[in-house]
Each structure stands twice: as C-alpha cells, then as structure tokens.
C-alpha cells in the first residue's frame, strides 16, 4: 500500500485522521492532538452514555478538555442505537501513568454529564466504579477486550467447580483462577502484575 510522504511521522508510524467514523461499524473514534503512547500500559474508562445526544456531549467535552491540557487519549463512542443499551457504549483510553493527573478533569466531565442526564447508573462488570455510569479498568494489553478476558476466567472457574451447588467452592475456584492469572478477585479491574495505585487515583478523582 502506498502511503503519502506527508502522512509518515517515522518509518514505522503513520499519521491518521483524528476523527474516524468508519473505523469500526457502529462506533465513532476520536484521538487526541498528542500521540497516545502504544508501548505503555493503558487505562480504560467506560462511560454509560444514555443516547446520541449524550454521545455528542461526551465527545465534545473529552476532546476540548483533554486536548486543551495536551493529554493523549483515544475515544471510542457508539453511534448505533442498539449499542447505547450497553454500559460500555463509550470507552476512553489513556496512559496509566497520567490517569491521576487527568482525574480532576474527568471528574468534572462526569459531573456535567450526570447533571444533564447523559449517564446511566450501571458500569461494566469487573470495572472499578468511580461515579455514576463511569467505570475504570486497566487495559489487558494484546488488543483484546477487557470484558472478554475476565469472562473467560470466570467461565473456566465455573467449569472447574463442576456441577457444585456449593457457593464457597465456586468462590474458591474463581479466586484460584484469577490468582493463576496474577489478578486478585477482589480487584478484577487490575491487570496481571499491576502496579497501578488506584487509591491515589480515587483521591485525585475526589478532589
């Protein structure tokens, strides 16, 4: 494939459009003015937006506030009516190292969206809920779905517990399965071998 010379940042990096409405059917993608580092651990922030108007508001607030602060991000927002029924209709990708720095800004955005009825109550399973309709999780890496990874772990635990109707046994199998992957069942929002300080983030979020 021929790439215009103006689109080449270096031999391995291509400059793409910031707004990409056709990258994945049913979703709108926006990226920051600053390149998102792909080799560093990422965080995912899930937004339970209530519909098309909420999607427009979220895109406007995120792009304006984070670009003004020169923070790198990718934003994936549903543009299909069916997807708005999900609690992960919008996902914001950020560097883990900078999450605490952007926490106050993201909290203000969530407050605005909540006041205007743009956020539902629920958040995706396994995430750390930080506000109404807003959940956080560490990106598992490898370009895989966070929810899929956790669901597969839970499924293996169910299979390993067999047909047992004993809740403690099922819980034990779940704990063992998650621990085998280096993840605590009590903190499923963290990735394997995580060093992320979620208490620091929550403190910054609440300021």
Regions of interest found by a model, annotated:
Residues 1-207:
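Structured alpha/beta or helical-core interaction and ligand-binding surfaces enriched in interleaved
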């Amino acid at each position: 494939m021929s790439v215009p010379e103006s689109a080449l940042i270096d031999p391995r990096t291509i400059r793409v459009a910031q707004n990409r409405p056709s990258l994945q059917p049913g979703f709108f993608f926006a990226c920051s003015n600053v390149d998102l580092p792909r080799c560093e651990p990422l965080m995912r922030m899930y937004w339970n937006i209530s519909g098309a108007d909420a999607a427009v508001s979220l895109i406007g607030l995120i792009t304006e506030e984070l670009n003004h602060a020169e923070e790198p991000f990718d934003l994936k927002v549903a543009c299909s009516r069916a997807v708005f029924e999900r609690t992960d209709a919008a996902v914001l990708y950020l560097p883990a190292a900078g999450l605490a720095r952007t926490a106050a800004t993201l909290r203000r955005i969530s407050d605005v969206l909540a006041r205007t009825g743009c956020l539902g109550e629920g958040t995706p399973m396994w995430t750390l809920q930080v506000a109404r309709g807003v959940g956080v999780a560490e990106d598992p890496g490898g370009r895989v779905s966070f929810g899929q990874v956790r669901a597969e772990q839970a499924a293996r635990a169910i299979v390993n517990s067999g047909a047992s109707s004993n809740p403690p046994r099922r819980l034990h199998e779940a704990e063992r399965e998650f621990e085998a992957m280096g993840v605590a069942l009590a903190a499923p929002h963290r990735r394997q071998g995580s060093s992320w300080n979620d208490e620091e983030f929550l403190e910054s979020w609440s300021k």
